[in-house]
A protein has these predicted regions:
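Short, glycine-/Ser/Thr-/acidic-enriched flexible segments
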Residues: 12, 32, 67-69, 170-172
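Active-site/ligand-binding-proximal alpha/beta "capping" segment
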Residues: 90, 164-185
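Feature captures the catalytic cores and cofactor-binding loops of soluble hydro-lyases/lyases
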Residues: 33-161
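Short, structured beta-strand/loop micro-motifs enriched in basic residues and often containing a Trp
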Residues: 2-11
C-alpha cells in the first residue's frame, strides 16, 4: 500500500499535478467550505462582474453543509456533499484559481475537462464518517453568505484531514479505475 501523502495548504498547481488517483492524503492548513447555494451566488456575482469574498487562487473547496456544533466544538458532523450538485458551477469556479475540491461521487465530463485545463485535483472524503472527519477540523468560521446557513462560505482550519484522490489532473477517475480489476470475474 502506498504511503500517505501529507499536504499543507495552499495547494499549488505544481503539487496538484503530482497527485494521482488512489493517493491517500492528509491535508493540514486552511480549506474553504461552500455548497451549491454558495456556488450559485458566486457564479452569479462573477457574471455581474463583481469580486468574490475571497481570492480562490491555490485554495481547496470542501463541499460541506455541517450540522450545528456541540458546546466546545468548532463544528458538528462534517461529511461531504455529493459533488455533482456543484457541477453546473464548477468550471467557472475553477477559472478563479481553485486547485482542489473535496466531496463525494463522480463528476461530469465538463468538470473533468476543466480540472485537466486548470491543474485541479478532486479528493473524496468518506461519506458516513462525518463525526470522524469533524475531529480534523480545528476551527470553522463563516466568512460570507451567512444567510445561507450551513451552505455559507466558511474558512476551516484543518489538521490531518483525511481524503483520497479520486480525480487527477490527467482526467483519471478512481471510481472507474478502482473497480476495473473486479469487473473481470
Amino acid at each position: 500500500m502506498a504511503e500517505t501523502i501529507r499536504l499543507t495548504t495552499p495547494l499549488t498547481e505544481e503539487v496538484s499535478r503530482k497527485l494521482k488517483v488512489g493517493d491517500s492524503v492528509l491535508i493540514t492548513g486552511k480549506i474553504y467550505s461552500a455548497r451549491d447555494a454558495a456556488h450559485k451566488v458566486m457564479t452569479e456575482a462573477l457574471a455581474r462582474g463583481e469580486k468574490l469574498p475571497i481570492d480562490w487562487h491555490d485554495k481547496i473547496v470542501y463541499y460541506l453543509g455541517p450540522t450545528p456544533a456541540k458546546p466546545g466544538d468548532p463544528i458538528g458532523s462534517a461529511g461531504p456533499t455529493t459533488s455533482g450538485r456543484m457541477d453546473a458551477y464548477t468550471p467557472t469556479m475553477l477559472e478563479q484559481g481553485i486547485k482542489g475540491m473535496i466531496g463525494k461521487g463522480s463528476r461530469s465530463q465538463a468538470v473533468v475537462d476543466a480540472m485537466k485545463k486548470h491543474g485541479v485535483t478532486y479528493f473524496a472524503a468518506v461519506g458516513g464518517a462525518a463525526a470522524l472527519i469533524a475531529k480534523s477540523i480545528k476551527k470553522y468560521e463563516v466568512i460570507a453568505y451567512e444567510d445561507l446557513g450551513p451552505e455559507a462560505l466558511a474558512e476551516l482550519t484543518v489538521e490531518d484531514f483525511p481524503c483520497i484522490v479520486v480525480g487527477d489532473t490527467e482526467g483519471n477517475n478512481f471510481y472507474e479505475l478502482g473497480q476495473k480489476p473486479y469487473r473481470e470475474i
